[in-house]
């Protein structure tokens, strides 16, 4: 008499699934029909970023304005404000660079902190590549092998162990 195995009994209970055609995970994120048919969660696609884009973002991260949604509204100046603004013109202005959709926006700020003007400028890809190459070449790389790191760690451990032993010996000898 042949007996049915436990695995085949479990598989008989699973009517909706087919073991001969498993669903690859990339189909779940690609088509919503597969996810709804088999009641599986969908996964958003991954957008891969090149190292050049990361270098650009890191470079311009320090030059972003404090508020990205800051809107400059011109104000009507009175005579006293005009005289103050003439004094401010003698002082040096600060410029803040921001990058949006491939355009570099240079905003000049007066000493009081108000935005005086914004100038968009398109930067060519050749200039971007030069900036990225310069940033990447400046960044120091610490190429220490795993074997060397382990050796340094063990030497440090042995040195500390020897110091502790010597300190304990001095303490016992009464020095």
Curated annotation (Swiss-Prot):
It is found in: Mitochondrion; Mitochondrion inner membrane. It is a peripheral membrane protein. Its main location: mitochondrion. InterPro entries: Pet20-like, Ribosomal_mS38_C. The keyword Transmembrane does not apply. Pfam families: COX24_C (PF08213), Pet20 (PF08692). GO terms for cellular component: matrix side of mitochondrial inner membrane; mitochondrion; ribonucleoprotein complex; ribosome. The keyword Cytoplasm does not apply. Keywords: Membrane, Mitochondrion, Mitochondrion inner membrane, mRNA processing, Ribonucleoprotein, Ribosomal protein. GO terms for biological process: mitochondrial mRNA processing; positive regulation of proteolysis. Component of the mitochondrial ribosome (mitoribosome), a dedicated translation machinery responsible for the synthesis of mitochondrial genome-encoded proteins, including at least some of the essential transmembrane subunits of the mitochondrial respiratory chain. The mitoribosomes are attached to the mitochondrial inner membrane and translation products are cotranslationally integrated into the membrane. mS38 is also involved in the splicing of the COX1 mRNA. Belongs to the mitochondrion-specific ribosomal protein mS38 family. Component of the mitochondrial small ribosomal subunit (mt-SSU). Mature yeast 74S mitochondrial ribosomes consist of a small (37S) and a large (54S) subunit. The 37S small subunit contains a 15S ribosomal RNA (15S mt-rRNA) and at least 32 different proteins. The 54S large subunit contains a 21S rRNA (21S mt-rRNA) and at least 45 different proteins. This is Small ribosomal subunit protein mS38. The lineage of its organism: Eukaryota, Fungi, Dikarya, Ascomycota, Taphrinomycotina.
